[in-house]
Design a protein with these regions (language model features):
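N-terminal module of bacterial RNA polymerase sigma factors
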Residues: 1-30, 34
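Amphipathic alpha-helical segments enriched in hydrophobic/aromatic and basic residues
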Residues: 13, 25-29, 39, 54, ...
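Short, small-hydrophobic-rich alpha-helical interface motif
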Residues: 16-17, 36, 40, 50-61
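Amphipathic, Lys/Arg- and hydrophobic-enriched alpha-helical face
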Residues: 29-47
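Short, aromatic/basic-enriched loop-to-helix "N-cap" motif that marks the start
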Residues: 64-80
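Arg/Lys-rich amphipathic alpha helix in sigma70-family domain 2
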Residues: 79-99
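Acidic, proline/glycine-rich intrinsically disordered inter-domain spacer in sigma factors
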Residues: 92, 96, 104-111
Length: 111
């Protein structure tokens, strides 16, 4: 049995940050990926984008583990997902804005 299954979030964070233990990250991922995916999917309705967003949040957690001062793990992860979803909306809103005038110009018959 995996010893990390019984760990609290605070214990996992300690092992992640201070011990640099990848098994702690793996346990955090197993514990929360489904909830985070569902949170993203509720807003985006796109499987691949949501999987990518969740993966990015966990990669960021690992890469920046020493820089972050995380007190409460799950609320931190939820906030990170919301931010990534917001950024996805922001990034994708720009495209239709610039494409729309071109479609209008193209649809005008030549004179």
């Amino acid at each position: 049995m995996d010893a990390f299954v019984e760990c609290t979030d605070k214990q996992l964070l300690y092992r992640l940050v201070h011990d640099e233990d990848e098994r702690a990250l793996d346990q955090i991922y197993k514990r929360y990926w489904r909830q985070l995916y569902n949170q993203a999917f509720k807003r985006l309705k796109h499987q691949e984008l949501c999987e990518e967003i969740v993966q990015d949040v966990f990669v960021d957690l690992w890469v920046n583990r020493k820089k972050r001062n995380i007190e409460h793990l799950y609320p931190y992860l939820q906030t990170a997902i919301r931010y990534q979803v917001f950024m996805m909306y922001h990034k994708n809103k720009k495209l239709p804005y610039f494409e729309q005038p071109l479609e209008h110009i193209i649809s005008i018959p030549p004179q």
